[in-house]
Design a protein with these regions (language model features):
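Short glycine/serine/threonine-rich phosphate/pyrophosphate-binding segments
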Residues: 152-158, 180, 329-336
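Electropositive, gly/pro-rich neighborhoods at or near active sites that engage anionic ligands
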Residues: 2-125, 175-291, 455-458
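An anion/phosphate-binding loop that grips the pyrophosphate of nucleotide cofactors and donors
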Residues: 317
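A short helix->loop->beta-strand "cap" motif at the edges of active sites that frequently abuts
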Residues: 166, 347-351, 390, 428
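A short, basic/flexible loop-to-alpha-helix module at the beginning of a structural domain
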Residues: 127-141, 306-311
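Charged helix-capping and loop-helix junction motifs
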Residues: 334-340, 368-372
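Acidic, Ser/Thr-rich low-complexity segments on the non-lumenal side of membrane proteins
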Residues: 138-165
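C-terminal functional extensions of proteins
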Residues: 4, 15-38, 366-467
């Protein structure tokens, strides 16, 4: 409001009438800001009131200790002061004036106190302390969300969800063996940090140099080309602390992460895929390059143990989201951890699967949403799991024709179609929404974080109303 007033004032060249009006609005804005600490939901007033009560109780305690003499003195002083004032001004005038003076002093004192705290705690932040307190209070009341997956899809979802809740847990696959993560995994013996780095950056509230630094990728330097600073940082912390989970916790504090990021397992997991033509492919990076339909995937060790923090997050979840992301290399690897699948099945929270916008050449050629769901069911069945892990599906309405779509089609990818009747006939409840990032603002066909998270939260609220 204040910025709009200032801009409007400048655009009229500082005319006297407009200047006066702007000053009036500015005064009203300042009063509103001063009173805003009284708004509900800040979890602040209760502690101020308790502090005030404590001071009063302490005063009475000291008075009793001193044989009540301070109270007598105080009462006598108040009566003397009131009597002296009312000799010159009637009570009908004196009372309201003194009352307003007291209220004004309280408001002014609290306002200046919060301003001082704001300058001390975050001198480089434009947002006012009360705005931050209100936003944090709102986020703390958000649902407890668990998002399971990996790759770009999961980090895209997290970027949007952090606007609705601070109680988010991302359970991330750790089977990557390509690129920077693969090199660090082979040479340092650490778990691949790439997907975890992306999720930490997505959940970071420190939208500044720190996040950019964490995502920075070296383009030159012997041994550094292709590595991101965040991958090196996480790998170094893992070597120092002894495990990736502790390294993530330390990194989360540095980046002011809203929520938590948890690896699906601490095991050194390697993926394999069995193709429909009988071939067997080793390694996550190789699976993404296959040109034959995948029958199923597995991993070494065969049944990796889940982290207790991942299981605890699922048990406490109010909403569980699977995907979006690469079907065989981002989503299903998490479901190779038996304890995670068991925890999902036991959870009473609504569980929703988000399908990709486009197929991936070689990996999901020709699959529509029904095909993706059947692939998940088949994978679980190969592990002896016949009970469904989700009953809700979120899919994109349609991918609009564009030169970008033509480019994808030329590379062997195509929009993932959604046959609502087929899915509903199988007992799934399907929701569709416009989830695609604007063509004019993106060089890729990806989910839009804001649209995706809005659709997820709309589903959650609808579910809560109906159940």
């Amino acid at each position: 409001v204040k910025d709009r007033i200032s801009r409007g004032h400048k655009s009229f060249g500082g005319r006297k009438s407009n200047s006066k009006r702007a000053n009036q609005f500015d005064l009203l804005w300042r009063i509103q800001r001063s009173l805003s600490w009284l708004l509900p939901g800040l979890v602040l007033k209760r502690w101020l009131i308790i502090s005030g009560i404590g001071l009063i109780v302490a005063f009475f305690g000291a008075s009793i200790w001193a044989d009540l003499r301070p109270i007598y003195w105080l009462v006598e002083g108040i009566f003397f002061l009131i009597g002296a004032i009312t000799k010159f001004l009637p009570r009908s005038i004196t009372g309201p004036l003194v009352f307003l003076l007291g209220i004004s002093l309280v408001i002014w004192g609290q306002s200046r106190s919060f301003t001082s705290i704001q300058k001390a705690v975050a001198p480089d932040k434009d947002a006012l302390l009360l705005d931050a307190l209100r936003a944090k209070s709102k986020l703390n009341r958000g649902p407890n969300i668990v998002a399971i997956g990996g790759g770009t899809g999961l980090s895209t979802l997290l970027k949007g969800l952090k606007k609705y809740s601070s109680r988010i847990t991302a359970i991330v696959t750790v089977a990557d063996d390509g690129g920077s993560s693969g090199i660090l995994r082979r040479e340092l013996g650490v778990q691949p940090p790439g997907d975890i780095r992306n999720c930490l950056a997505a959940l970071s509230t420190e939208e500044s140099l720190l996040t950019r630094l964490f995502q920075y990728r070296f383009s030159s330097g012997t041994g550094l080309v292709g590595h991101s600073f965040g991958n090196l940082f996480l790998s170094a912390l893992t070597s120092i602390t002894g495990n990736l989970e502790t390294a993530i916790t330390a990194s989360s504090r540095v980046l002011a992460v809203q929520g938590q990021v948890v690896p699906a397992t601490n095991a050194d997991v390697s993926l394999w895929a069995e193709l429909e033509n009988g071939d067997r492919i080793e390694g996550e990076s190789a699976i993404g390059k296959v040109r034959s339909p995948i029958a199923r995937i597995g991993c070494y060790p065969e049944y990796p143990a889940a982290l207790p923090s991942a299981i605890e997050a699922i048990e406490n979840a109010e909403l569980i989201v699977l995907g979006p992301g690469s079907l065989y290399t981002s989503l299903l690897p998490n479901l190779l951890v038996p304890q995670i699948v068991e925890a999902i099945q036991k959870s009473k929270a609504p569980k929703i699967y988000i399908c990709n916008l486009m197929t991936q050449p070689g990996e999901t050629d020709g699959l529509d949403v029904t095909g993706h769901v059947r692939a998940i069911e088949a994978q679980l069945a190969s592990l002896g799991i016949t009970r469904r892990i989700f009953n809700f599906i979120l899919a994109h309405e349609s991918v609009a024709p564009s030169p970008l779509l033509d480019y994808y089609l030329s590379r062997g990818a195509e929009p993932v179609q959604c046959d609502l009747n087929s899915l509903r006939a199988q007992g799934y409840k399907v929701f569709t929404a416009s989830l695609q990032k604007g063509i004019s603002t993106s060089a890729t066909l990806r989910h839009d974080p804001a649209r995706l998270s809005r659709a997820v939260m709309h589903f959650y609220r609808k579910y809560k109303r109906e159940n």
